[in-house]
Amino acid sequence: MTRKRILRAAVDVISEKGFKSASMREIARRAEVGDATIYNYFPTKESLLYGYCEEKQREVAEALKKIDDFNEYTLREQLQQLTETELALWLPDREFLAEVFTLTFSAPVAGAVNLAETRRLFNHMVEEMIDAAIEVGEIPDQPYRELLAPLYWDYFTGVLAFWLKDDSQGYANTTQLVDRSVEMIAMVLQTALIGKALDLFSFMFRSQISRHLEKLSDYTAPWKQAKRRFMDGGDG
């Protein structure tokens, strides 16, 4: 498939030369397509970079679907399998992923926009796991459920950043981090602690805002009174 061939060539060239030094022409030549063809699929180098991230999420989803008894895994096991599968599939392209991180964090706003589809695909997998766990009563219904998958995305981004800097043999430190942190996340979900904490913060925030608005009203009352007298006393 032409699209996948272009993406594979982009990964190879960017990994070898870095994002800034890689050229669309060289990627097209490596993919054995014409210069016009590559622009039909990917108008910019950035779209190539982030397009591969999207493709990687589709590969992860397919890999999980091929596990026959995946639906029988506990939520903790599913989240751990997701995280480990991501790392395993990114391993051959670790240098490329480092380029993704460099570009994304050098321009965070643009990076967030460019990663939107990748993030959506990842979050969808997490949402499926959480929803299934709630349906069978493995975990209680979660307040602010829509925030859980984005929070796991943020967590996983941190795992990737840690992994890219991990120089332990076989990335053993990353393995330990994932084992311990996923266990903690599963425990938090079983107690619906995130929702309860957000409820508490929401209550405290509303209370503080209410108090400050009352004080603000006291401060602004004289101004409003003075302004009314001024408006009422003009010649017009």
Predicted regions and their residues:
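Hydrophobic alpha-helical connector segments
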Residues: G51, K65-E99, S106-V109, V113-L121
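Soluble, non-transmembrane catalytic domains of enzymes that act on hydrophobic metabolites at membranes
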Residues: K4, R8, Y50, F101, ...
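Short amphipathic alpha-helical elements of helix-turn-helix/winged-helix folds
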Residues: A9-V13, L89
